[in-house]
Amino acid sequence: MKYVAAYLMTVLGGNEAPTAADVSRVLEPVGAEVNPEVLKTLIDAMQGKAAHEVISAGLEKLQKVPCGGGAAAAAPAAAAAAGGGDSSSAAKETKKEEPEEEEEDGDMGLSLFD
Protein backbone atom coordinates (compact mmCIF):
# COMPACT_ATOMS: atom_id res chain seq x y z
CA MET A 1 0.00 0.00 0.00
CA LYS A 2 2.88 2.34 0.72
CA TYR A 3 4.10 1.91 -2.85
CA VAL A 4 0.70 2.81 -4.28
CA ALA A 5 0.46 5.83 -1.98
CA ALA A 6 3.93 7.03 -2.94
CA TYR A 7 3.15 6.46 -6.62
CA LEU A 8 -0.04 8.52 -6.34
CA MET A 9 1.78 11.27 -4.44
CA THR A 10 4.27 11.45 -7.29
CA VAL A 11 1.43 11.65 -9.82
CA LEU A 12 -0.25 14.40 -7.79
CA GLY A 13 3.08 16.22 -7.80
CA GLY A 14 2.85 16.46 -11.58
CA ASN A 15 4.76 13.39 -12.77
CA GLU A 16 2.24 11.42 -14.87
CA ALA A 17 4.57 8.42 -15.35
CA PRO A 18 6.73 7.98 -12.24
CA THR A 19 9.71 5.65 -12.35
CA ALA A 20 10.90 3.37 -9.56
CA ALA A 21 13.50 6.00 -8.64
CA ASP A 22 10.78 8.67 -8.36
CA VAL A 23 8.72 6.53 -6.01
CA SER A 24 11.82 5.60 -3.99
CA ARG A 25 12.58 9.30 -3.50
CA VAL A 26 9.19 9.67 -1.82
CA LEU A 27 9.62 6.64 0.45
CA GLU A 28 13.25 6.86 1.55
CA PRO A 29 13.16 10.24 3.35
CA VAL A 30 10.51 8.93 5.74
CA GLY A 31 12.53 5.81 6.51
CA ALA A 32 10.30 3.38 4.61
CA GLU A 33 12.03 0.23 3.44
CA VAL A 34 11.87 -0.12 -0.34
CA ASN A 35 11.57 -3.57 -1.89
CA PRO A 36 12.74 -3.15 -5.50
CA GLU A 37 10.83 -6.21 -6.72
CA VAL A 38 7.50 -4.96 -5.39
CA LEU A 39 8.17 -1.49 -6.71
CA LYS A 40 9.08 -2.85 -10.15
CA THR A 41 5.84 -4.86 -10.22
CA LEU A 42 3.83 -1.73 -9.47
CA ILE A 43 5.65 0.38 -12.07
CA ASP A 44 5.23 -2.36 -14.70
CA ALA A 45 1.53 -2.74 -13.90
CA MET A 46 0.93 1.01 -14.14
CA GLN A 47 2.89 1.37 -17.38
CA GLY A 48 0.70 3.15 -19.93
CA LYS A 49 -2.20 3.64 -17.52
CA ALA A 50 -3.48 6.85 -15.98
CA ALA A 51 -3.88 6.69 -12.19
CA HIS A 52 -7.42 8.08 -12.27
CA GLU A 53 -8.48 5.41 -14.78
CA VAL A 54 -7.08 2.62 -12.58
CA ILE A 55 -8.90 4.04 -9.56
CA SER A 56 -12.18 4.24 -11.53
CA ALA A 57 -11.78 0.65 -12.72
CA GLY A 58 -11.13 -0.46 -9.14
CA LEU A 59 -14.25 1.30 -7.88
CA GLU A 60 -16.34 -0.41 -10.55
CA LYS A 61 -14.96 -3.80 -9.50
CA LEU A 62 -15.64 -3.07 -5.83
CA GLN A 63 -19.27 -2.26 -6.62
CA LYS A 64 -19.69 -5.75 -8.07
CA VAL A 65 -18.36 -7.56 -4.98
CA PRO A 66 -21.13 -8.96 -2.79
CA CYS A 67 -20.67 -7.65 0.70
CA GLY A 68 -24.08 -8.42 2.13
CA GLY A 69 -24.66 -10.99 4.79
CA GLY A 70 -27.42 -8.96 6.38
CA ALA A 71 -30.17 -10.93 4.65
CA ALA A 72 -28.74 -14.27 5.76
CA ALA A 73 -28.47 -13.10 9.36
CA ALA A 74 -31.95 -11.60 9.33
CA ALA A 75 -33.63 -14.78 8.06
CA PRO A 76 -33.18 -16.89 11.25
CA ALA A 77 -34.24 -13.96 13.40
CA ALA A 78 -37.38 -13.47 11.33
CA ALA A 79 -38.15 -17.20 11.49
CA ALA A 80 -37.77 -17.19 15.27
CA ALA A 81 -40.04 -14.17 15.60
CA ALA A 82 -42.66 -15.76 13.35
CA GLY A 83 -42.41 -19.04 15.26
CA GLY A 84 -44.16 -17.67 18.31
CA GLY A 85 -43.42 -17.97 21.98
CA ASP A 86 -40.90 -20.83 22.20
CA SER A 87 -37.59 -19.01 21.88
CA SER A 88 -35.59 -21.87 23.43
CA SER A 89 -36.34 -24.16 20.48
CA ALA A 90 -35.24 -21.40 18.10
CA ALA A 91 -31.97 -21.07 20.00
CA LYS A 92 -31.39 -24.83 19.81
CA GLU A 93 -32.19 -24.77 16.11
CA THR A 94 -29.58 -22.12 15.35
CA LYS A 95 -26.92 -24.07 17.25
CA LYS A 96 -27.47 -27.11 15.01
CA GLU A 97 -26.52 -25.20 11.87
CA GLU A 98 -23.23 -26.31 10.37
CA PRO A 99 -20.47 -23.73 10.19
CA GLU A 100 -19.88 -22.32 6.74
CA GLU A 101 -16.76 -23.38 4.91
CA GLU A 102 -14.16 -20.68 4.69
CA GLU A 103 -13.50 -19.37 1.23
CA GLU A 104 -9.99 -19.15 -0.08
CA ASP A 105 -8.38 -15.76 0.24
CA GLY A 106 -7.98 -14.68 -3.33
CA ASP A 107 -8.20 -11.45 -5.18
CA MET A 108 -11.98 -11.98 -5.51
CA GLY A 109 -11.75 -10.71 -9.06
CA LEU A 110 -10.40 -7.38 -7.88
CA SER A 111 -7.13 -7.25 -9.78
CA LEU A 112 -6.79 -3.70 -11.03
CA PHE A 113 -4.25 -4.59 -13.66
CA ASP A 114 -6.12 -7.18 -15.77
Curated annotation (Swiss-Prot):
One of its GO terms (molecular function) is structural constituent of ribosome. The keyword Ribonucleoprotein applies. GO terms for cellular component: cytosolic large ribosomal subunit. Gene3D superfamilies: 1.10.10.1410. Signal peptide: none annotated. Residues 76-91 have a biased composition (Low complexity). Residues 76-114 are annotated as: Disordered. It holds the Pfam family Ribosomal_60s. The keyword Ribosomal protein applies. CDD domains: Ribosomal_P2 (cd05833). Keywords: Phosphoprotein, Ribonucleoprotein, Ribosomal protein. It comes from the Eukaryota. Phosphorylated. Belongs to the eukaryotic ribosomal protein P1/P2 family. HAMAP family: Ribosomal_L12_arch. Plays an important role in the elongation step of protein synthesis. P1 and P2 exist as dimers at the large ribosomal subunit. This is Large ribosomal subunit protein P2.
